[in-house]
Amino acid sequence: MITLYNTLTRQKEVFKPIEPGKVKMYVCGPTVYNYIHIGNARPAINYDVVRRYFEYQGYNVEYVSNFTDVDDKLIKRSQELNQSVPEIAEKYIAAFHEDVGALNVRKATSNPRVMDHMDDIIQFIKDLVDQGYAYESGGDVYFRTRKFEGYGKLSHQSIDDLKVGARIDAGEHKEDALDFTLWKKAKPGEISWDSPFGEGRPGWHIECSVMAFHELGPTIDIHAGGSDLQFPHHENEIAQSEAHNHAPFANYWMHNGFINIDNEKMSKSLGNFILVHDIIKEVDPDVLRFFMISVHYRSPINYNLELVESARSGLERIRNSYQLIEERAQIATNIENQQTYIDQIDAILNRFETVMNDDFNTANAITAWYDLAKLANKYVLENTTSTEVIDKFKAVYQIFSDVLGVPLKSKNADELLDEDVEKLIEERNEARKNKDFARADEIRDMLKSQNIILEDTPQGVRFKRG
């Protein structure tokens, strides 16, 4: 039984799908005017884990994540680079797939694009105008916010509270300061489309409503995105979707926390804006993913190199323990009376499922993985290995790897760099000083499996490749 925190109700709820055995999930994707930053990577990774866990539990997941390929930022970039909006969008959509692919994010069932749904968007807006929920003014089309009675239910704000900060900017032709744009009148030189309202382009909020409706129907199970999208974007999506469809837009709303850089908000003005395209040249993408899921998705996460290094070390320990299990599989025999270990492995798997069932708590799931690695190390160092137990270890390691999306072997597992070997030797020396001989032996065995031989010399431990 999976429970998740629903932003709409502000409480954990048991997940009940619209269709038995199926999950319809929509995740707000990026505006494709640049490479994605690590703030964009967090929802991509977190909701990929959510999808993977649903699938592990037997659900068929229809996972839709859009590309915003028409937007003010894209138009500005187009003017700066003297390139067309579609050219820029194509470049950064390809870059997005490359970056999230490196982070082991699985491809969505569908990645709808705004430009491909322009006729659908225009018709959706026309329907809202016909129903009295929207109106034309000065070439723009606005949504009548007050007409939708449930406005504010996602962000838990009242119309009166919202009115205090609302204003009508120069050039806008709203009936009410709370109204928001569905269609923008074209400006000279901007990309635009013909419509019953005149030349123009859609507003940001209407795009997601239409693509979600087209791909998944009037009501979806889960709508997800970053906390910054809760208001006004998701609030406006609810208003226009429910006004149009006369049905709940999404039964569950999930929002992930922010990313800070060295305890400061990430921003271009502070010079701490980190692009995934750049950071994965310095940090192993598997480590970056492992770091991202080391904190519960709803909690803020602080990015700094010290914490990333801690994640690298933790993932290395898991992988080293799995390597020992694989090595022992070659010499394992049919030994009986080892049910105690089978039971312990099952208990860890049950704990993993329990914490993942509780709002996808990846932080506690990783703790279970560490415990599995610790038990594996203890087993191979203290026992003649049983085929049954080794196979059980391998199966559960694979489950954890598949659900969390972290491979059990690095992409360059067979190409251990000299600097990595030196770090392992330092760690082994420290372990021996602390009389942690099990860890010291584990490192020695791991290096040996890579044909790296350690030699004691008067100058200290040296290594050579066999």
Swiss-Prot record:
Binding site for Zn(2+): 28, 208, 233, 237
Cofactor(s) needed by this chain: Zn(2+)
Top-level taxon of the source organism: Bacteria
EC number: 6.1.1.16
Description of how the protein assembles with itself and partners: Monomer.
Family: Belongs to the class-I aminoacyl-tRNA synthetase family.
Protein name, as recorded: Cysteine--tRNA ligase
Protein's organism: Staphylococcus aureus (strain NCTC 8325 / PS 47)
